[in-house]
Amino acid sequence: MKVFILCFLSGNELDDIRVCIDFETAMKFLERYKKSHQVLEYNVTEGITDESPVFSYWYKDDVLVKHVF
């Protein structure tokens, strides 16, 4: 299972945190708020998210960027 954290990143602070379990919905949210938000993708192990995200997604100059951790 995967969990997607939709958030506003301000420096090292996370604000406006929302949780989604569907990739398509997370990407729709990101498209809507692409100037200010990012999506962090986590694996879920034994009912809880892993310590670190697997991927992060954000827009830079209207181009979707995917970062692998």
What spans do the regions from the language model cover?
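A short, charged, amphipathic alpha-helix used as a generic interaction element across diverse proteins
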Residues: 8-11, 21-42
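Short structural boundary motif marking the start of a folded domain
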Residues: 1-5
